[in-house]
Amino acid sequence: MIILLTGMPGSGKGEVAKAFKKLGIPVVSMGDAIREEAEKRGIPKTPEGLKYVSLKVREELGPGAVAILIAPKLKNLLKKHKTVVVEGVRSPKEVEEFRKLFPNEEIKVLAIHSPPGARYERMRKRGRSDDPKTWEEFLDRDKKELNFGIGEVIALADYMIVNDDSFQKFKRDIEVIIRKILYFNHQ
């Protein structure tokens, strides 16, 4: 089974990925695939460089490009593991591509939803170099994500976690949903 993890920036995808890793379930990051591709092409891993690589691979391979890039790694992992998680799916075309590339695998989409204000605060605190510095930058980034089609992926998810309360409640919700996904799909 392949679990496609999606959510707006700062929604809590990283925490969900950590929970899967703790259970020994491998997690492949779509963002890492772009960073690796940038390195291969000798392009700096700055926000501008990564955006360029992201657009370039989509131009070369189509809208499901990142799914194509990580497919070999996924195929390898699925030889040893019943379940693999893909973190950072952003468009319906990527979901489509995974279904095409892995026709014999059960594919489930898990979305994390969190209100904009909470996501903005979280992103400010984590301090990644590509995180927005102002509310306007944050709204701009959200607009770009929504233009990719992430809203549609979230809306059509098989499972949803709403991260709008305490961190403890979020962690409990993660555990519950992971158990539900693994139980119902390994019967």
Curated annotation (Swiss-Prot):
Amino-acid biosynthesis found in the keyword field: no
Coiled coil (residue ranges): none
Binding-site residues for ATP, renumbered to this chain: G7, M8, P9, G10, S11, G12, K13, G14
Superkingdom of origin organism: Archaea
UniProtKB keywords: ATP-binding, Nucleotide-binding
Molecular-function annotations in GO: ATP binding
Family: Belongs to the UPF0200 family.
Protein name, per record: UPF0200 protein PYRAB09750
Protein source organism: Pyrococcus abyssi (strain GE5 / Orsay)
